[in-house]
């Protein structure tokens, strides 16, 4: 749908009649960008935006019309099926803002190479052209050792949930009240801690390498305090949308990322029960607005 087609709505009798047409109309009205219809029968559309702050409203529109919100830098579009899709491209590389010495806040489009040049040494082994969303969602960029998700330097995330509600995820303790007013988060936190107590997670905590799974080790007070946002490191785009990242610069050689210290063929005796992860997905993203793990395009494959 082109911009000039949009202005015909309501003037020449061209009005949206179906849920899909109404969805496209709302997206067009929000972005004033050309919508590329990839497949009208399967209801797959693509939009390119310049303002990353439109993500929350786009997610809200997707939730209203039960359309998947998929970020083009994370998804293998050929593996997606079974539901209407909005493929989102963001033509913007933002720059970090420093809130104090060695601590910055950066949008998901900020390039990892820019952060590395500014002294954030945890990005040493991340390809410089990748952005924070790609880094956050790719398991192989994060520390291979249990309890060491702290070496990401990630402190907090301004998070958007599949119902378009927001929360700042970070440290979590007895007096935390971040779940108040957010139904999905309110249901998800007990489920996260429930999974953290399973046999599989208990075994992984004493293993030499954490698998390519959610970082439930971040829910244990060991070398660092409990941190909710670090649970989702390497989440493959499946559970939350990370909009803005609060990151602390780390000295060199603090991180042992999986893409450097482990091989792809290394087998894990224990992995998190997939049924537990499926139940978590149904709680935190019941409509499937975000992608599923098997729809994620591994960064190593994208760069071949």
Where would I find each of the regions flagged by the language model?
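Short glycine/threonine-rich loop-to-helix capping motif typified by GTGT followed
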Residues: 17, 221, 244, 261-276, ...
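Glycine-rich, small/acidic residue-mixed loop/short-helix segments
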Residues: 233, 249-250, 256-266, 272
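A charged N-terminal "starter" segment
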Residues: 1-21
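FAD-binding subdomain of flavoenzyme oxidoreductases
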Residues: 108, 113, 120-255
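Structural signal for hydrophobic packing residues in well-ordered secondary-structure cores
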Residues: 24-31, 62-66, 112-120, 140, ...
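General beta-strand structural signal in soluble alpha/beta enzymes
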Residues: 2-9, 35-39, 46-49, 67-73, ...
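Glycine-rich N-terminal segment of FAD-binding domains in flavoprotein oxidoreductases
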Residues: 18-109, 120
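Activity-critical C-terminal alpha-helical subdomain
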Residues: 270-304
């Amino acid at each position: 749908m082109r911009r000039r087609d949009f202005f015909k709505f309501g003037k020449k009798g061209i009005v949206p009649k179906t849920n899909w047409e109404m969805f496209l109309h709302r997206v067009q009205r929000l972005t004033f960008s050309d919508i590329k219809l990839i497949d009208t029968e399967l209801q797959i559309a693509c939009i390119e935006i310049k303002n990353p702050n439109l993500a929350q409203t786009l997610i809200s529109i997707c939730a209203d019309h039960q359309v998947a919100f998929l970020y083009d830098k994370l998804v293998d579009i050929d593996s997606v099926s079974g539901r209407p899709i909005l493929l989102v491209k963001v033509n913007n590389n933002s720059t970090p803002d420093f809130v104090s010495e060695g601590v910055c806040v950066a949008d998901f489009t900020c390039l990892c190479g820019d952060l590395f040049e500014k002294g954030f040494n945890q990005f040493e082994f991340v390809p410089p052209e990748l952005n924070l969303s790609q880094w956050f969602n790719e398991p192989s960029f994060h520390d291979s050792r249990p309890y060491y998700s702290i070496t990401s330097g990630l402190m907090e995330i301004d998070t958007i949930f599949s119902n378009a509600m927001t929360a700042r995820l970070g440290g979590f303790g007895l007096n935390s009240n971040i779940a108040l007013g957010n139904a999905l988060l309110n249901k998800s936190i007990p489920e996260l801690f429930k999974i953290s107590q399973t046999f599989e997670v208990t075994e992984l905590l004493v293993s030499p390498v954490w698998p390519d799974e959610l970082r439930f080790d971040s829910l244990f007070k060991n070398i660092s305090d409990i941190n909710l946002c670090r649970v989702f490191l390497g989440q493959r785009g499946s559970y939350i949308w990370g909009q803005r990242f609060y990151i602390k610069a780390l000295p060199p050689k603090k991180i042992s990322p999986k893409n450097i210290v482990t091989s792809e063929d290394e087998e894990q005796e224990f992995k998190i029960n997939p049924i537990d992860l499926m139940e978590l997905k149904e709680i935190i993203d019941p409509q499937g607005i975000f992608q599923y793990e098997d729809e994620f395009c591994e960064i190593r494959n994208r760069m071949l």
